Structures are given as structure tokens and as C-alpha cells.
Amino acid sequence: MKRARLSGSPLLRVTPALAVVLALTVGLAARSRAVAAEQDGRAERERIAAALVEVYTHASAPDLGSPWQSAGVARYNGSGVVIEGNRILTAAHVVAHHVEVSVKRQGTTRRHAARVTFSGDACDLAILEVDDESFFAGVKPLQLGELPRLGDSVTAYGFPLGGESISITAGIVSRLEIGVYSHSGEELLQAQVDAALNDGNSGGPIVAGGELVGIAAEVLESAENVGYVVPVPIIEHFLRDIEDGRVDGFPNMGIDAQPIENKALQASLGLTDGDHGALVIRVDADSTGAEVLRPGDVLLAVDGLPIGRDLTIGVPGVGRVAASYAVRRRQVGETVKVELARDGKRLDREVVLLATRPLVPDTQHGQPSYLVYGGLVFQPPTRDFIELFEEPPS
């Protein structure tokens, strides 16, 4: 049987006039969607701006060379953001050595006295509170979001130098790794962004999808548009830390380890090409690691995360970062499992995570203690105190 193709007039014949109408209709619909998206974006920016706070600090830093006196009173400006519980989250260095702190909301003229209730110097975060409840009228606190991925768009809000009003800059997350926080010298998870950050942005919110994903912390002065952000996992760690009313900081294993990439070293430790781990070469006394580790052990995994021969771990949602993050992402006092190899045997152990207590701290936070005896002045050393007496390079 032959099949005949249907013929005749099409169901819809597009005339020139109808084509024009259709084009106009499609164009108007696209225009309407664009206008609606623009209005939504504007409303979101206004909501975030309403939660933005300018922080004014009068500080009196100690004179480390003469600990009985201060280095004088200085004035600093920074930024902050209202979060759940009518609390203001900012950077710790914005309110360091504070004598007086006041805050002002975007679009208002009145300053309100604020109290620094918690300061997490290790992660450069602080919580401020304002007793006057009218300060928070009409504010929707920013909610914490998810950790952005590499290449994700972010927006920085704050009050940087160069003007009096709010500044909004956009960029992307260009790097996510363990980095040194200049305020404390601690090595913690850190995000790098290319959004323009300047003095005064410190403590301001980094936003993605209308949610808080970071706090602006510092910039690389030798480069343009290289800013560093305290990412949301560190913010969450800090907020959980202070739930008991005190700041414990971040735990540390307290060991030094070296990669096991040399084949001769692998053979001496009885490892094959498929094995992983890090060679422990030093264990601090009274540290977390002192309970179960000793030099010569091969640390295989911590908290269920295998340690690569390059001293990195793979963390879901974060990627490969330094192995120290396996411990530092946990709270002081928590228990984690440790897998190790010793004398050819594999061992499973549990350790209680202890706070970091360096013999010589990096930075002096607060007024230093001192003792005058027999015409001599004694005070606990810190690295910034030692640097006072280092000779400048020739």
C-alpha cells in the first residue's frame, strides 16, 4: 500500500503582519522578564544594604616595648552585617584593642553604642551587640549560605575609603585554600576573590544568592583586586564555638609531617605505590597528637579523610586542601578517629581535640602582662614583640 503525503494549506500561515505582531509580543515578554529580574535584583540589594552596618572604633593598642603604656588612641572605620539574633558580625581586627565602638546603619544618621561580646582573633571574626532594640527596626538578618565554588559570582558590600555611602562591588571566587590570616598568623580555610576590596571593607559581607558566604578580611597590597575572605565554614565554626559563652578557637594536631613521595622513603616505610599517608617527624608535647602519635609513624587518615602523599585531603564541597583542615574544621573537645601505620601494623585510635596553645604566640591580643623586678622588665614573648628588636635588613 502506498502512503500519500498530506498536502494542502498549512494549519497556520504566517503573514508579514502576523510576524510583526509575534516579534513584538516576544520582545515585550523578554523585556518584561528583564525588568522583573532587574526589580528583583534591586530589591535584594536593598534588603542586604539594610542589614549593612558601618563600624567606628576608637582603639588604644599596647606599646610592646613599654607595656605599661599604650601606643596612643587611633580611630578606625570598618563594616559589619546583621545576622540572626540581632547580632552584628564583623572582622576582629576592626575592633582590636577597642576603647569605644559605635555602629551606624546604612541610610541613617545616628550612631549607636555597641559592645564587643566575642572576639575570635584566630579567625578574625567578632560579634557586636547593641542594647537599643530600635537599631534593628526593619532589618532582615542575613542568613548563612553555602560555600561558593571556584568561579562563582560574589558581591562585596561595605564602606571603603573614598566616600561616605555604601559601596557594592562584584567579582568571582578565584581560589579556595588554607591560608595565613594576617591578624593572627593562624592557617585556616580562606577564599580569594577578585572583587575590589579596600580599607573600610573589612568586616563587610560577601554575598552570593542573597545569602552571606563570607566576611571581607584583607587584601594583597602588591596586586590589584586580590582580596581575602573568611569563608562561611569558618563563620559557622566561630558561631558554634561561642554557643557556650566563650571562645575556644581551633584545635590543632600539634605535629610536623613530611610528604612521602620519594620511592626510597616509601620502601623504607614498607609502603607500596598504592598507599597514602604522611610521615610524622615531630610531635609537640601536651598536644592532641601526643596522645597517639610519635615520630616515625605514618599518618594515614584523620576523621575519615585519607591523607595524600602531598599532605592534602579531599573535602566534599571544598576540594583538596592542606591536611590540617581535617582537624581545624572540628571544635575543641570533639573526638575524631585517627588511622596510622607503625612498625608495619595499621592502628585505629581516637583523640580528643585540644586547643592551639603555642609556646610563643604570633600576636599580642589585649594589654600585655609584665613584671618589674630589680630594675628589669619581664613580659611573655610574642612574635610581634620579638620583631621589635630585629635589625632591619641592610
Q: What name fits each language-model region?
A:
Residues T15-A29:
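Bacterial N-terminal signal peptides
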Residues A43, R47, V81-E84, A92, ...:
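C-terminal recognition in membrane/secretory proteostasis and scaffolding
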Residues A51, V55, D63, Q69, ...:
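Active-site region of chymotrypsin-like
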Residues D40, V73, V94-A96, E100, ...:
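Flexible, gly/ser-rich surface segments that form the specificity/activation loops bordering the active-site cleft
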Residues E38-I88, A96-S102, T109-R111, D132-F136, ...:
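Glycine-biased strand-turn-strand hairpin within the trypsin-fold
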Residues M1-L12:
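N-terminal secretory signal peptides that target proteins for export/translocation
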Residues H97-R115, R149-T155, I166-G179, P233-E236, ...:
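Beta-strand/loop subdomains of soluble extracytoplasmic proteins
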Residues A61-P62, V82-I166, D199, L347-D348:
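Conserved active-site neighborhood of the chymotrypsin/trypsin-like protease fold
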